[in-house]
C-alpha cells in the first residue's frame, strides 16, 4: 500500500488535449499523494500543514476554472500576498496622452502624462466543510493489509476528496459571482450611459434646470424604448444596433494587452457579452450570422504585485498558476517557500493555452459571447443578471368624450350598437397576462368608492383649515362670502334692501367655477382650483365674526358638481342611460312641450289667471266653484291665442286633468294637460332606478337614490303644510312650527279668527295633506319641467290677499243683500277689465258680472297672505356621515305664493316679486314689478341673466346649504325646451351617497365621476452585461484555511481574500434589460378593498353600514375593539382568499376618483396618476420648500402641460386622493399595515422628496462621470451611483410616472386592435377610446404564449 500511486486509487480520468483539464487532473493527483505523505506512518513527513495543502489545491482549481469562463475576458488577475491586510488600496497609473502633429506654424502639442488614481474594493469569499472524527481517524491510522482496512481508508479518502471537490467548486462559483457583482456595481444601465454620452458636461460645470430636465426626459424615453428589446421583435438589425450601441458606449481599459484572449487570426477580443441562458439562446437564434466559435489564446498565469518602499506599483511580473506540490513540500517553512518554479508538466516558456469561446462580431470588433448558467445551476444563488422589475400602470374608467367633439381614427370600421353603454362607457377592458379579457366597471370598484373614508370630509376640512389663507387678489375673489340667516318674517320685510343699496355682490366660488369652461378650469390662473378637493363636498371660504373660515358642505346631488367637472352634455348622456335602463317608451310629447313652452315664455298672460290660482290654491272645492270660469278662460286663450293657461301651476294642472274631461274645454287643450301629467309620471318612472318596494332605514330605497323622492326636499310652492315625515325644522317666524302652532282652516263655516289673522305670521293648513305621490310629482314639475321649459324665466311672487279681496270684492253689489247681489252689475272697472282680458272682449256686462260673482263665491276657501317658510333638515342616513352628521340643509319655500311667468301690471300693488330660488328669480319680471330692482339692473346690467347670476337677497342666497346650486340654474337657463332637458334635470337630482352610487353602478348608470385605476405588476427579467477587455483587475493571494476541531467533527473554513480595481478610462461596462422572463403577477382586475385597508371605519348608521357591506361584497362585519387593535398594530389580511387562482399572484388595482372631463390624452402617455407631475428636475429637491411648491402649488403650471393639474381631487394637498394614499395621513385613518398600496409611491410626500433627491443625485453624479478620466477629474471612480439599482428595478417610482396600459372602453375596440397587433397606438372612436401601451407588453405576451 505504501507504494501506491494516486492513479491507482482515484478513478481513471482520461486527460484530453485541453491543457486546463491536464492541470486539474495533475493537481488532484498531487494533492492525493501529499495527503498520503501527511497521513502516512512516517512522523517526519508531518512538516506539511493539511490546511496549506487544501488552500493550494482550491486556489489552483479555482483559478483554472475562472480562466476558462468568458467572464475572464473582462479581468486582469494579479497576485498580492498581503491583500488580506489591505483595507483600502489606491493604485496610480501613468497614462501618456496621444498627440497629433501639426503644421502651418501651429504650436505643436506638448507631451502630456496623466496620473489616474484607482481605488481597490475588498471582497473576500468564504466556504467551509466538515469532516467527521471517524473519517479523520481512518485517515490517521496506518494502512493495513486487510481488505476491510483498505476499504475504510479508501472511503475516508474519497470523503475528503468529495468535500474538497465541493469546496473547490464553491470557490470557483464564488469567485465568478464576486467578479460578476463587482462588474454590475460599475455597470450603469445602457440608457443612462447613452444619455450621459449625449449630454456631456464639464465636470466642474453646474447643471442648469434646462439641462437637468432634458437629461431626465431623455433618461425616461430611453428607458421605455430599451426595455425588453429582445421581446419587441425579431429584427436582427434592430437588436444588432442595440448591442453595437452597448459596445460603443463603454470605454477601453487602461491595460491594453493584446496577448490575452486573441483569436488564431490575431484578432483580440474587445470585450465580453454575458447574459442568462434564455437571452443568450435568443440572441444566438436571431444573430446566428454574426456568431462563431473561435479558438482563443487564454492565460494560464496571473500577474504579481511587487511593492516598493513608497507603496506604489513599480513593476508587474508573471508567475505560474500552479506550483509543483513536491517542491512546495521541500520548501515549506523555509525562506525559499515563495520561490517555487513553474510546474514540471509545462514547457517553461509557455504561458497561454488555447480555449474555444463563442464570439459575436459587432462591427469590426469581436467580443466573447456566453452565459454563466453552469455557474449558478442547482445553487441557491440566483444569476445576478436575472433581476426583478416593478412597473406601475394606470388606465381610466368612465372618462367622458363629448359627442360634439367625437370622431373616429379607427382604420377598420368598428360597428357598435347605438346604446348608451357605447355612448357613455362605464367599463374598461384589457387583457391579463394569460390574454384573458378583463373587465372593470363601476360596480367592481364599489369596495373602494363606497368606503366610509371616501364619504367623510373631516380630514379634508381640517387640512384646509391648517393651510394659509389666500392673499391679495385671490382673497378678494374667494373670501368675501357671508352667510346671512334671518327669520322668514323679516326676510319679506328686508327683501329689497340688497337692490336698494345698489352695490356689487361678490360671487361665491360655485359661481366662479361654473363660469369657466373645461380647459380654463384646470389652468393655474383659476382661483377656485385649490377649493376643489373632493368630488362629494363643496369647500369655500366665508366671513364669520370678522374672520375668514373654511366652510365644507355636502354637494348632496350629482347636479351640484361644477359644470367644468360634469358638463351639460355629460348629464344628458347620463339621462339617456336612465331612459335606456327604464326602457322608456317614445311617446310623442313634442307638441305638448311646444305649446307649454310658448305659453310659459309668451309674455302675455291674463292676470285673472293669477287671481284664480290664489282663489283655488289647490283646493278641490274652490276649483269646482270656479270650474266654469276656468274652462272659459282656458278655451278662449287656447282657441284665440294658442296659450295653455295654468301651465305654471302643478295643482291647477292636476285639477284640470282630473275634473275637466267633460268637454268643458277643447279636447286638444285637455289632451295637453293630460300629457303634462303623463310626462311627469314618465319622469318619475324613469328616475326610479332602484327597487321602490325595498326599504332601508324605514324609508323606500328610491329615496336614497334620487332627491326628488326624498321627503327632506320640499316643493318650492305649497298651499298646505306638507307631510313632515323627516322631522324637518320648518320656521315661519322666530320659532319652529309644531303641530300645536299650525292652525287648521275651517272652510264653509264662520272662520272669523282666520280672517282676522289673514295677514299675520300665523300659519294655517288644510286637514287634507297631499299624498306622497303628488308631492313627488309636484317636485318634478317645479324642479324639472318648469325650469326646463321656461329656461328660468319664472319668478316667485307673494300676494297680499287681504287687500286684494277688500279692494276687488268689498264693494257693491258683493256687500249687498242677496236680491241686489243677483240683480246689480259689477261696478269695479279693474275686475271687469281683468275678466275681459281673460274671457275676451265679446262678453256682455251681464256675463262678466256673472263671472265676477262666481269668483266672489269662492272666497269662502280663500287662503292667507304669502309667507316664506325656512326648512332646515338633515340629510338622509347614508349622507349623514362624518362631518355631515351635523349638516342641516336649508330651503326657502313660498307658502300661499304663486309662480309668475309674466309680470303683473294691473294688480301690481297687491303682488310682490320674491326671487327666492334660482329657478324662480327672473330679473325681467322682478324689475318690471319693482322699481328698486329695475334701478339695480340698470346700474349693473350684467345681472340681467337667468343662469343664477342675478343676486338673490342674502338670507335667500345660501348656495352651500341649498339642495339645488348654481349648476342646476346654469343648465336650465340654456337647455333646449325638450323632454331630454326635463329628464336631465331629474337625473341631476341623483344623490352623491354610497347607497346611490351602489344603486347606479349596479344598474350600469354612470355615477357622475370617473376613476383612474393604478396597478403595479412584478416581472422577472433578464439583463445583458457588456464589459470591455480587462476592465477590472482582480488582486488575490492564496486562500486561508483554518480548522476548528470539535468532539465529533472538524470544520475547515476557506477564505479567499480578493480586491478589485476598476481599470476603465470611463465606464467600461454597461447593462441592458433585454428579455422578459416571466410575469409574476396576474395583471388582472382585482380592486383594492378599502374595507380591509381601513378596517376600523364604519358608517354612522348601522343599517346603512350593513347594507353597504352586503352590496359591495364585504360580508364580514366590523371588527371588535380587540381585533381592531391587532389589525392596526400587527396588520391583518383576508382570511378567505379565492378558492381558485388561475393566473398567479393577484395584482391590486387602486382607485383614484377623477373628474369625467379629464383629458383622455393624459392617459396615453406616461404620467403621474395623481394628475400632477411629481418629478422635479427643475427644482432643487434639497430645497424642500421649493419642492413642496412644485408638488402642491397649483398656481404654477404643471411640468407636462399648460394646466395646473388634470385631477384636483388627487393632486391638491389634503384632497381625497392625498388623504387615501399619502402614508403621512395613515395614523389618522387607522391603516392596516399589511395592505399594499401601488399609489403610495405617487402620493407620499416624504417618499417623493426622497426619490427626487436620489434622482437629482443620480443625474448630477453621472454627469460628473460623463467624460473619461483623461479629460476630467482623474480621481473619479467610475462606479454606479447610489440608487441606480433601485432606479432600474422600480423605474416608475423614480420617474414618478405610471405607464399606459393597453385598454379600451369597449370590448370591440380591444378585440379589433389585438387582432391587428396595433397595441401601441391610441385611438378614438366617437365616445369610446382605446389607450395604447408604451411598452409593447401585449405583443410580448402574445408572442410568448
UniProtKB/Swiss-Prot annotation:
Q: Does the keyword Cell inner membrane apply?
A: no
Q: What is its main location?
A: virion
| Entry coiled-coil feature ranges | none
GO CC annotations, alphabetized: host cell nucleus; T=16 icosahedral viral capsid
Top-rank taxon: Viruses
Please give the Gene Ontology molecular function terms for this protein: structural molecule activity
Keywords noted in UniProt: Capsid protein, Host nucleus, T=16 icosahedral capsid protein, Virion
| Compartment(s) | Virion; Host nucleus
Output the InterPro entries linked to this UniProt entry.
Herpes_MCP, Herpes_MCP_upper_sf
Please give the subunit comment from the record: Homomultimer. Makes the hexons and eleven out of twelve pentons. Interacts with triplex proteins 1/TRX1 and 2/TRX2; adjacent capsomers are linked together in groups of three by triplexes, heterotrimeric complexes composed of one molecule of TRX1 and two molecules of TRX2. Interacts with scaffold protein; this interaction allows efficient MCP transport to the host nucleus. Interacts with capsid vertex component 2/CVC2. Interacts with the small capsomere-interacting protein/SCP.
- HAMAP family the UniProt entry points to: HSV_MCP
Give the record's family classification: Belongs to the herpesviridae major capsid protein family.
Q: What does this protein do?
A: Self-assembles to form an icosahedral capsid with a T=16 symmetry, about 200 nm in diameter, and consisting of 150 hexons and 12 pentons (total of 162 capsomers). Hexons form the edges and faces of the capsid and are each composed of six MCP molecules. In contrast, one penton is found at each of the 12 vertices. Eleven of the pentons are MCP pentamers, while the last vertex is occupied by the portal complex.
Protein's name according to its UniProt entry: Major capsid protein
- Which organism's genome codes for this protein? Human herpesvirus 6B (strain Z29)
Amino acid at each position: 500500500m505504501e507504494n501506491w500511486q494516486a492513479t491507482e486509487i482515484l478513478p481513471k480520468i482520461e486527460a484530453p488535449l485541453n491543457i486546463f483539464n491536464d492541470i486539474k487532473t495533475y493537481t488532484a493527483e498531487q494533492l492525493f499523494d501529499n495527503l498520503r505523505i501527511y497521513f502516512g506512518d512516517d512522523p517526519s513527513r508531518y512538516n506539511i500543514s493539511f490546511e496549506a495543502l487544501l488552500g493550494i489545491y482550491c486556489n489552483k482549481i479555482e483559478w483554472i476554472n475562472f480562466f476558462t469562463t468568458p467572464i475572464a475576458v473582462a479581468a486582469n488577475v494579479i497576485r498580492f500576498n498581503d491583500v488580506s491586510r489591505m483595507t483600502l488600496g489606491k493604485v496610480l497609473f501613468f497614462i501618456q496622452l496621444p498627440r497629433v502633429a501639426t503644421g502651418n506654424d501651429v504650436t505643436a502639442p506638448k507631451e502630456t502624462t496623466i496620473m489616474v488614481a484607482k481605488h481597490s474594493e475588498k471582497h473576500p469569499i468564504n466556504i467551509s466543510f466538515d469532516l467527521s472524527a471517524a473519517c479523520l481517524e481512518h485517515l490517521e491510522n496506518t494502512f493495513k493489509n486487510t481488505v476491510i482496512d483498505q476499504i475504510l481508508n479508501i472511503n475516508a479518502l474519497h470523503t475528503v476528496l468529495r468535500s474538497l471537490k465541493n469546496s473547490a467548486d464553491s470557490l470557483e462559483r464564488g469567485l465568478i459571482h464576486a467578479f460578476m457583482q463587482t462588474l454590475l456595481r460599475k455597470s450603469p444601465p445602457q440608457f443612462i450611459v447613452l444619455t450621459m454620452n449625449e449630454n456631456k458636461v464639464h465636470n466642474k460645470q453646474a447643471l442648469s434646470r434646462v439641462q437637468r430636465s432634458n437629461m431626465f426626459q431623455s433618461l425616461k424615453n430611453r428607458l421605455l424604448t430599451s426595455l425588453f428589446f429582445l421581446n419587441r421583435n425579431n429584427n436582427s438589425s434592430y437588436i444588432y444596433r442595440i448591442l453595437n450601441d452597448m459596445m460603443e458606449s463603454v470605454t477601453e481599459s487602461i491595460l491594453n494587452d493584446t496577448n490575452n484572449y486573441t483569436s488564431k487570426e490575431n484578432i483580440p477580443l474587445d470585450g465580453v457579452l454575458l447574459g442568462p441562458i434564455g437571452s443568450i439562446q435568443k440572441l444566438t437564434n436571431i444573430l446566428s450570422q454574426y456568431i462563431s466559435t473561435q479558438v482563443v489564446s487564454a492565460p494560464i498565469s496571473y500577474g504579481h504585485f511587487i511593492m516598493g518602499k513608497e507603496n506604489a506599483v513599480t513593476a508587474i511580473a508573471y508567475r505560474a498558476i500552479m506550483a509543483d506540490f513536491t517542491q512546495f513540500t521541500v520548501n515549506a517553512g523555509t525562506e525559499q517557500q515563495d520561490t517555487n518554479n513553474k510546474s514540471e508538466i509545462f514547457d517553461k516558456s509557455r504561458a497561454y493555452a488555447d480555449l474555444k469561446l463563442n464570439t459575436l462580431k459587432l462591427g469590426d470588433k469581436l467580443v466573447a459571447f456566453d452565459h454563466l448558467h453552469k455557474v449558478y445551476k442547482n445553487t441557491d444563488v440566483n444569476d445576478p443578471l436575472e433581476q426583478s422589475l416593478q412597473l406601475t400602470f394606470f388606465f381610466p374608467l368612465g372618462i367622458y368624450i363629448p359627442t360634439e367633439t367625437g370622431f373616429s381614427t379607427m382604420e377598420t370600421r368598428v360597428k357598435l350598437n347605438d346604446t348608451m353603454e357605447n355612448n357613455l362607457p362605464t367599463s374598461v377592458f384589457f387583457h391579463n397576462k394569460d390574454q384573458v379579457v378583463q373587465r372593470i366597471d363601476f360596480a367592481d370598484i364599489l369596495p373602494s368608492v363606497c368606503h366610509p373614508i371616501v364619504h367623510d370630509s373631516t380630514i379634508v376640512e381640517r387640512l384646509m383649515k391648517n393651510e394659509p389663507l389666500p392673499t391679495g387678489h385671490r382673497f378678494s375673489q374667494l373670501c368675501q362670502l357671508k352667510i346671512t340667516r334671518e327669520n322668514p318674517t323679516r326676510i319679506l320685510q328686508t327683501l329689497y334692501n340688497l337692490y336698494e343699496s345698489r352695490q356689487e355682490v361678490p360671487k361665491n366660488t360655485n359661481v366662479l367655477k361654473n363660469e369657466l369652461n373645461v380647459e380654463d378650469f384646470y389652468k393655474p390662473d383659476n382661483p377656485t382650483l385649490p377649493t376643489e378637493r373632493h368630488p362629494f363636498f363643496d369647500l369655500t371660504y366665508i366671513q364669520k365674526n370678522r374672520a375668514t373660515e373654511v366652510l365644507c358642505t355636502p354637494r348632496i346631488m350629482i347636479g351640484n358638481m361644477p359644470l367644468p367637472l360634469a358638463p351639460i352634455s355629460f348629464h344628458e348622456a347620463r339621462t339617456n342611460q336612465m331612459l335606456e335602463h327604464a326602457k322608456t317608451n317614445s311617446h310623442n310629447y313634442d307638441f305638448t312641450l311646444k305649446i307649454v313652452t310658448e305659453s310659459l315664455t309668451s309674455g302675455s298672460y291674463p292676470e285673472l289667471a293669477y287671481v284664480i290660482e290664489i282663489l283655488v290654491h289647490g283646493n278641490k272645492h274652490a276649483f269646482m266653484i270656479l270650474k266654469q270660469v276656468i274652462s272659459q278662460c282656458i278655451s278662449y286663450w287656447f282657441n284665440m291665442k294658442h296659450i295653455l293657461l295654468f301651465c305654471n301651476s302643478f295643482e291647477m294642472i292636476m285639477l284640470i286633468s282630473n275634473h275637466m274631461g267633460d268637454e268643458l274645454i277643447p279636447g286638444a287643450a285637455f289632451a295637453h294637460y293630460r300629457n303634462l301629467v303623463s310626462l311627469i309620471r314618465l319622469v318619475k318612472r324613469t328616475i326610479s332606478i332602484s327597487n321602490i318596494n325595498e326599504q332601508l332605514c324605514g324609508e323606500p330605497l328610491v329615496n336614497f337614490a334620487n332627491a326628488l323622492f326624498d321627503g327632506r326636499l320640499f316643493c318650492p310652492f305649497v298651499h298646505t303644510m306638507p307631510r313632515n315625515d323627516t322631522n324637518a325644522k320648518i320656521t315661519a317666524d322666530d320659532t319652529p312650527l309644531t303641530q300645536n302652532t299650525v292652525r287648521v282652516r275651517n272652510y264653509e263655516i264662520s272662520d272669523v279668527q282666520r280672517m282676522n289673522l289673514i295677514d299675520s305670521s300665523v300659519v294655517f293648513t288644510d286637514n287634507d295633506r297631499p299624498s306622497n305621490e303628488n308631492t313627488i310629482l309636484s317636485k318634478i314639475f317645479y324642479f324639472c319641467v318648469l325650469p326646463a321649459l321656461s329656461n328660468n324665466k319664472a319668478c316667485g311672487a307673494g300676494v297680499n290677499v287681504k287687500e286684494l279681496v277688500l279692494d276687488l270684492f268689498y264693494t257693491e253689489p258683493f256687500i249687498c243683500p242677496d236680491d241686489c247681489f243677483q240683480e246689480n252689475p259689477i261696478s269695479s272697472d279693474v275686475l271687469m277689465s281683468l275678466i275681459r282680458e281673460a274671457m275676451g272682449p265679446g262678453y256682455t256686462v251681464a256675463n262678466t258680472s256673472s263671472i265676477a260673482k262666481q269668483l266672489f263665491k269662492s272666497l269662502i276657501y280663500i287662503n292667507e297672505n304669502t309667507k316664506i317658510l325656512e326648512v332646515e333638515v338633515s340629510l338622509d342616513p347614508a349622507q349623514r356621515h362624518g362631518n355631515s352628521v351635523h349638516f342641516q340643509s336649508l330651503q326657502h319655500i313660498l307658502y300661499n305664493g304663486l309662480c309668475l311667468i309674466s309680470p303683473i301690471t294691473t294688480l301690481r300693488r297687491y303682488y310682490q316679486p320674491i326671487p327666492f330660488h334660482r329657478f324662480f328669480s327672473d330679473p325681467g319680471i322682478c324689475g318690471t314689478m319693482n322699481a328698486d330692482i329695475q334701478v339695480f339692473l340698470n346700474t349693473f346690467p350684467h345681472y340681467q341673466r337667468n343662469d343664477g347670476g342675478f343676486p338673490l337677497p342674502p338670507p335667500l342666497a345660501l348656495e352651500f346649504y341649498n339642495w339645488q346650486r348654481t349648476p342646476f340654474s346654469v343648465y336650465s337657463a340654456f337647455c333646449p325646451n325638450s323632454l331630454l332637458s326635463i329628464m336631465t334635470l331629474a337625473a341631476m337630482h341623483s344623490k352623491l351617497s354610497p347607497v346611490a352610487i351602489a344603486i347606479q353602478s349596479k344598474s350600469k348608470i354612470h355615477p357622475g365621476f370617473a376613476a383612474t385605476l393604478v396597478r403595479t405588476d412584478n416581472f422577472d427579467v433578464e439583463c445583458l452585461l457588456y464589459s470591455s477587455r480587462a476592465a477590472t483587475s482582480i488582486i488575490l493571494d492564496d486562500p486561508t484555511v483554518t480548522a476548528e476541531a470539535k468532539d465529533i467533527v472538524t470544520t475547515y473554513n476557506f477564505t479567499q481574500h480578493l480586491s478589485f480595481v476598476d481599470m476603465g478610462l470611463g465606464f467600461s461596462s454597461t447593462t441592458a434589460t433585454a428579455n422578459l422572463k416571466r410575469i409574476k403577477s396576474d395583471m388582472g382586475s382585482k380592486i383594492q378593498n378599502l374595507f380591509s385597508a381601513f378596517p376600523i371605519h364604519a358608517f354612522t348608521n348601522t343599517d346603512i353600514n350593513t347594507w353597504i357591506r352586503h352590496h359591495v361584497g364585504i360580508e364580514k362585519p366590523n371588527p371588535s375593539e380587540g381585533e381592531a387593535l391587532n389589525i392596526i398594530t400587527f396588520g391583518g389580511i383576508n382570511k378567505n382568499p379565492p378558492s381558485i387562482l388561475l393566473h398567479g399572484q393577484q395584482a391590486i388595482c387602486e382607485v383614484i376618483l377623477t373628474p369625467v372631463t379629464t383629458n383622455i390624452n393624459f392617459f396615453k402617455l406616461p404620467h403621474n396618476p395623481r394628475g400632477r407631475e411629481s418629478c422635479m428636475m427643475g427644482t432643487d429637491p434639497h430645497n424642500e420648500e421649493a419642492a413642496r411648491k412644485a408638488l402642491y402649488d397649483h398656481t404654477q403650471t404643471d411640468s407636462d402641460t399648460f394646466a395646473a393639474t388634470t385631477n384636483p381631487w388627487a393632486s391638491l394637498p389634503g384632497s381625497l386622493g392625498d388623504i387615501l394614499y399619502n402614508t403621512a395621513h395613515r395614523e389618522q385613518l387607522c391603516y392596516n399595515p399589511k395592505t399594499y398600496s401601488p399609489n403610495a409611491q405617487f402620493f407620499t410626500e416624504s417618499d417623493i422628496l426622497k426619490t427626487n433627491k436620489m434622482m437629482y443625485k443620480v443625474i448630477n453624479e453621472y454627469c460628473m462621470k460623463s467624460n473619461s478620466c483623461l479629460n476630467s477629474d482623474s480621481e473619479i471612480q467610475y462606479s454606479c451611483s447610489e440608487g441606480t439599482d433601485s432606479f432600474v428595478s422600480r423605474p416608475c417610482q423614480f420617474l414618478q410616472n405610471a405607464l399606459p396600459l393597453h385598454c379600451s372602453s369597449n370590448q370591440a375596440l380591444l378585440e379589433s386592435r389585438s387582432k391587428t397587433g396595433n397595441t401601441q397606438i391610441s385611438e378614438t372612436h366617437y365616445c369610446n377610446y382605446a389607450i395604447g401601451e408604451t411598452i409593447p407588453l401585449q405583443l410580448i405576451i402574445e408572442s410568448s404564449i
